[in-house]
């Protein structure tokens, strides 16, 4: 069904450019650039990675007057076909979301040398690919410091989608930040795993309760759509708090999500789309950290009073030290 939706969407765009394109060109004097995005599994509504990516291109569509379409694959096996579909349909930029896109994009990109591609959280060394990476350790260090200051048990938790080096960078930064402010801290880590690690809220809720039963009172979830299970767990347990990831999840359970480590996929995609429109988009690796506007904490909208001005000032000071280089998150 999703392939049919994509096909119909592409067909409508081709019909538009074939039939109504002359009128558009007469009105604006220029052709709209087309951007297609293949989301990661879990799709929209994850309040995390995919939602952030979508928000960035929606903003780019409004500000740069581009055509924008997206597709939500049901499984990893569909990634390559959807990337190929967009490129074959003549899209100017095809965006691949997530590290699992690396292998499919390596196969597709060389077949379309005149099409520009961008991939988030992976490196594809092709002359027509922009690889977008984030210094997630910096943001995880920040939220780890929040957890280290706020825990009442000196025990905090981490839930990852799978146990792999890329995701463990989040865990490592989180541990380092917690230890930076609280030398007595213990961090317990569990992983969702299974056949759909980034879209299994039931398993993430089970792991959240297991961590709670082992004294963890704050849990950082880095598991895409599975993280909804963590949010459900904190909503049902008065003495359990969450830290969100990728998008601002603070409002999902007001007052129970201390902060969110915002990996600003939205800002990165907005930036490279602007470069595309200006004819300045180049291939290669782009790294977005706190200093580059690619990483931040959320605004503590619902937890300012709970955390308190003194701790918030310490968190701000840590951020400034990271930007200046005084604190280096290795």
PLM features: what roles do these ranges have?
Residues 1-5:
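Positively charged n-region of N-terminal signal peptides that target proteins for export
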Residues 7-13:
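Core hydrophobic alpha-helical membrane-spanning segments
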Residues 15-18:
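C-terminal motif of bacterial Sec signal peptides marking the signal peptidase cleavage site
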Residues 22-330:
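A residue-level marker of the well-folded mature domains of exported/periplasmic proteins
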């Amino acid at each position: 069904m999703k392939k049919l939706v994509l096909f119909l969407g592409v067909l409508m765009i081709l019909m538009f450019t074939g039939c109504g394109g002359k009128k558009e060109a007469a009105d604006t004097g220029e052709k709209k650039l087309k951007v297609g995005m293949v989301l990661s599994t879990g799709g929209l509504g994850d309040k995390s990675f995919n939602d952030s990516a979508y928000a960035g291109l929606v903003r780019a569509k409004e500000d740069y007057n581009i055509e924008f379409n997206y597709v939500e694959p049901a499984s990893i096996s569909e990634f390559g076909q959807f990337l190929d579909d967009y490129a074959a349909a003549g899209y100017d930029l095809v965006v691949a979301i997530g590290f699992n896109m690396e292998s499919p994009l390596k196969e597709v990109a060389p077949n379309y040398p005149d099409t520009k591609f961008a991939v988030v959280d992976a490196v594809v060394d092709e002359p027509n690919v922009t690889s977008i990476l984030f210094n997630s350790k910096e943001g995880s260090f920040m939220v780890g410091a929040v957890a280290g200051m706020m825990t009442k048990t000196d025990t905090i938790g981490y839930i990852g989608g799978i146990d792999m080096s890329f995701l463990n960078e989040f865990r490592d930064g989180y541990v380092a930040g917690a230890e930076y402010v609280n030398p007595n801290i213990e961090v317990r880590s569990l992983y969702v795993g299974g056949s759909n690690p980034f879209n299994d809220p039931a398993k993430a809720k089970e792991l959240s309760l297991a961590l709670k039963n082992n004294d963890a009172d704050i849990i950082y979830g880095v598991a895409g759509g599975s993280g909804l299970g963590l949010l459900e767990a904190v909503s049902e347990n008065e003495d359990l708090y969450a830290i969100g990831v990728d998008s601002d999840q603070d409002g999902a359970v007001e007052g129970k999500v201390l902060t969110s480590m915002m990996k600003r996929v939205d800002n990165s995609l907005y930036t490279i789309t602007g470069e595309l429109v200006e004819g300045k988009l180049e291939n290669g690796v782009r790294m977005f950290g706190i200093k580059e506007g690619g990483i931040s904490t959320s605004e503590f909208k619902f937890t300012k009073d709970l955390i308190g001005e003194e701790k918030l000032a310490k968190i701000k000071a840590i951020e400034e030290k990271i930007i200046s280089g005084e604190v280096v998150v290795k």
